[in-house]
């Protein structure tokens, strides 16, 4: 059979997806985290892989799904949180713009799976399935009640799940995980389609969403999930020593307030007393596309006058950040390669060819 006749849509997908294959899985496994540091990789959206100096591996909000894929239904799902927020009817054009950089089914070494809340782009059934099928049978699934309800509904045993609420602390090897208050107001209007929000006091945030502070021997990481700006970031900054903070950033469409702005990101960093602030989430949705350089420009305008004690860092999906080695860097660039140039003799027609 000729090659063009044997190739199918399915074979094409299997040969190209996930786009990075197991490249990043292998990189993470091979990484030896030096004492006094921690390493983390951006998996897209608010997905983070954190690795400590003791070799402890945890992932947070690792999501392997997609956004809109068809114009088939021109209307938004009835009762969707964005419909409640802005009174819209049209389909939200939120296409996923980020490649899949980590293969969940190539994960072998992991010590905990965490989620900040139960929105579809922060918790994933494929990740749960891969960990259940391929990893140690004592890996815990940690999150607020709504997340645990989802995991159990997918088939994760109840005894493998740990429900956390603000104030709880979970120890995973050499990483101490503190569950903190979340400020994700969108989560409060994520309700069953038939349930009305108008005129009804929302139920508590604690069962729906949490922020996390990861205390490793080499430093601390604050993960804010989908939280909006809140004055309570200052309380967290008073109560905890924070080295690196991650904040959900995006260009909110007209009539929508769902992501922090550049000014919010700077306010969050100042309130938390962090050393480094890193925006995330702006990468994933086509209709929330934002330029993180705006954060740096605004920081440059304000840093001397307001005596900022932090720096912004502009990351790339799939890239690594190591604390404190990268604390004075402003931007990430993927490894450029060719560091071994001229270790063998070039094969050119003549020296001045290039």
Curated annotation (Swiss-Prot):
Alphabetized CDD domains for the sequence: UlaG-like_MBL-fold (cd16284)
Domain of life according to the entry: Bacteria
The protein's required cofactors: a divalent metal cation
Keyword Hydrolase: yes
Alphabetized InterPro entries for the sequence: L-ascorbate_6P_UlaG (IPR023951), Metallo-B-lactamas (IPR001279), RibonucZ/Hydroxyglut_hydro (IPR036866), UlaG-like_MBL-fold (IPR048021), UPF0173_UPF0282_UlaG_hydrolase (IPR050114)
GO CC, one annotated term: cytoplasm
Gene Ontology biological process terms from the UniProt entry: L-ascorbic acid catabolic process
Main location: cytoplasm
Reaction catalyzed: L-ascorbate 6-phosphate + H2O = 3-dehydro-L-gulonate 6-phosphate
Localization per record: Cytoplasm
EC number(s) from the headed UniProt entry: 3.1.1.-
Keywords: Cytoplasm, Hydrolase
Induction pattern: Induced by L-ascorbate. Repressed by UlaR.
Any one GO molecular function term: L-ascorbate 6-phosphate lactonase activity
Pathway assigned to this chain's UniProt record: Cofactor degradation; L-ascorbate degradation; D-xylulose 5-phosphate from L-ascorbate: step 1/4
Enzyme class: hydrolase
Family of this protein: Belongs to the UlaG family.
Protein purpose: Probably catalyzes the hydrolysis of L-ascorbate-6-P into 3-keto-L-gulonate-6-P. Is essential for L-ascorbate utilization under anaerobic conditions.
Protein name: Probable L-ascorbate-6-phosphate lactonase UlaG
Organism: Escherichia fergusonii (strain ATCC 35469 / DSM 13698 / CCUG 18766 / IAM 14443 / JCM 21226 / LMG 7866 / NBRC 102419 / NCTC 12128 / CDC 0568-73)
Source taxonomy: Bacteria, Pseudomonadati, Pseudomonadota, Gammaproteobacteria, Enterobacterales
